[in-house]
């Protein structure tokens, strides 16, 4: 009588594929499922930068809510306390607000919409850019959006990740248009069209809704278009060459943003 090749148990007549008893076959199936689950990459591994940025935004929002800030209709004073951008404080002695304001949101609807947009764009950005290029592009575009808002509306407050998100869209538009990426022409045209429509629709929406700070959107978008265009030439270069170029690009960009901040600080009048 044949025996199971796994456990040595005698097999009943009737045929058993590969000479494995039902019990061992069931155990092997369960073990294979567990191994597949263990080896399956998590979202954090697949989208590390996007997951980290979204996690930071959610943590700030939870911190605000747990401290007593309304999750649906927060007061301006609470938003400013948590790092919103406002001319009186940002230009006086708290310049870090041009960065922290990108992680402060005006209620749950605001953060949900922004994080949904970031998740959608981030899935693409993780494939086009390396991690540092993605994160620095997002950060610098967010700062550029804050500076645009500060320069044009110094007496208003600003908060939210939309400037950085517009910047990410702009960088992707430039990368797909100028970067010679190894993407089929049809897919590239379709992606470009979707990115342009995303930016155009949201700019139009921002123009017709008075409460939306479209200057931050435009500032972030322009910064992203420029950064993406400058970075595009080395997106497919060898790692050492790409990293060297990235360092130079963001060093110069940082100096430019710093100079813009001091120009606004000197010439823009705020109450």
Go through each PLM region and give its residues.
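A detector for small-residue-rich transmembrane helices and their helix-helix packing motifs
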Residues: 2-271
């Amino acid at each position: 009588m044949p025996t199971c090749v796994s456990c040595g148990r005698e097999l009943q007549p009737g045929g058993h594929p590969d000479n494995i008893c039902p019990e061992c076959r069931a155990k092997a199936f369960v073990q294979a499922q567990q191994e597949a689950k263990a080896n399956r990459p998590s979202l954090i591994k697949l989208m590390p930068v996007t997951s980290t940025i979204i996690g930071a935004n959610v943590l700030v929002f939870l911190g605000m809510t747990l401290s007593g800030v309304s999750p649906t209709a927060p007061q301006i004073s609470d938003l400013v306390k948590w790092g919103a951008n406002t001319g009186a404080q940002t230009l006086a002695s708290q310049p870090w607000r041009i960065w922290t304001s990108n992680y402060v949101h005006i209620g749950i609807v605001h953060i949900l919409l922004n994080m949904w947009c970031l998740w959608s764009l981030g899935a693409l950005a993780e494939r086009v850019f390396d991690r540092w290029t993605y994160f620095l592009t997002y950060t610098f575009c967010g700062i550029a959006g804050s500076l645009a808002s500060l320069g044009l509306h110094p007496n208003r407050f600003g908060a939210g990740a939309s400037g950085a998100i517009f910047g990410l869209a702009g960088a992707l538009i430039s990368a797909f248009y100028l970067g010679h990426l190894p993407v089929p022409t049809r897919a590239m045209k379709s992606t470009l069209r979707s990115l342009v429509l995303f930016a155009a629709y949201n700019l139009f929406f921002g123009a017709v809704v008075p409460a939306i700070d479209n200057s931050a959107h435009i500032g972030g978008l322009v910064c992203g278009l420029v950064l993406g265009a400058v970075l595009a030439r080395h997106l497919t270069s060898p790692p050492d060459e790409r990293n060297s170029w990235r360092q130079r690009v963001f060093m110069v960009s940082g100096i430019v943003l710093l100079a813009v901040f001091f120009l606004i600080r000197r010439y823009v009048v705020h109450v």
